[in-house]
Amino acid sequence: MKASTRLLWNFLSVLILLLLSPTAPTAERFEIPPTLPAQTLVPASLLSGDGFRVQQQVPTDGLMAHFTIQSDVGTFQANSIEMLRIRVGEIPAIMELNKTSKSKVFVQSVGRNAARPVQAAGQMVMHPVDTVTGLPSGVGRFFGRVGLAGQKLKQAATEPEGAPAGEKAGQFATTAGQATRNVFGYEEERRHLAKQLHVDPYTTNPVLSKQLDDFALTAFRAHVGVTTTIGVLVPGSMAITATRVVSTWVWDKPKADLIVQNQKALQQLLVPDRVIKAFMGNPVFPLSVQTEFVSNLKLLSGIPGTGEAVTLASTAESEEQARFLTDAVGMLVRYNDTQTPITRLIVRRAIIGRDRNGAIVVQAPVDYVSWTALVSTFAHRSDFAGSRRTIWLTGQLSPMSRENFRTLGWTVNEKVNPIPDVDESR
């Protein structure tokens, strides 16, 4: 037999086997994620209000909705319903600060103190761990009296990888934490101002973040408090995260103390030091979201898989991914408290629970799920086979997705409340 004939015969044999195989893929019909009217996704109160309106046509990507907010203070993109709530809630704060910046007292304070935005400080607030090594040469030039405490802060942040996380956390607490409380009055002013405005001091909104920088620096350098009053709070203005406001920690605790608190909590969960370092150093997690993730995970203490969940979170590549994982863990906490206890976290691409009855529990903080190849692959996951499967979504499924999930044996729960009913003191 000629070589070419043998190759052709081998190819045909493989092709026939594939066609006859019971696991051979069959043609499947998928959806193109639609553009939807905004009112089908969110309540009217989030679509228009004092100084803002949301574009009526909202593109979706198969999981999330992408909103455009047009306002008197700029145009903002929100790549999920959660981010829409947050960004809409920040607009009154931006408007209030705009108004206050024109007041006589503020203008005089700026003139006397030549207060300017602090670029390095603003970066540190948004990504505290990622930029802490640049503190003495960055923010340090504005606060010359940091002195020895500032040098120890740098040492704590640049400790060799082999140093125990507990040792680094303790040193960080006794040096950097005290320095932040006593010397970084700027940071304290920023948190206090954010609390007055009911916004996240670690917001990634560039407009609001810059305003918080300007006002906090003015108040710190002029020794004059900035007082604001928001007359109208739009729905969602307290939505620092989709799951719940992170108690009052993000407002009342110095940044360094929050970092140490998170480190210690992860150590108590027996997360390896190298994983803690990778997670704490991931710049896509705003400190508020990082704190929420750790707080939620702590409520699942003792359940196998928590370490793997932190490992996965350390690989998040965007704020949207960070919030998704944080909210998913928060929803698992709610299920654990109100439905059936979770006995294990299954961490393979996502953070999924298995409850005491053996059911697979998928908590999905998504907006609108279309039946795409990606969603189909997830719904057909072989490691879910043989178990009762439930999926809980904060948003909704397309009709095709709903039908296909149910046909595959999934129990579907849509538009669930993601807020865990937990005691903040736990």
Where are these regions (language model features)?
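Amphipathic interfacial helices
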Residues: 95-148, 171-234
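Acidic-basic catalytic patches of nuclease active cores, encompassing PD-(D/E)XK
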Residues: 265-350
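Cationic, glycine-rich low-complexity segments
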Residues: 28-160
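Membrane-engaging insertion elements
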Residues: 140-161, 241-281
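N-terminal signal peptide c-region/cleavage motif recognized by signal peptidases
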Residues: 21-22
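Bacterial N-terminal signal peptides that target proteins for export
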Residues: 2-12
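Domain-level recognition of nuclease-like catalytic cores that cleave nucleotide substrates
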Residues: 396-426
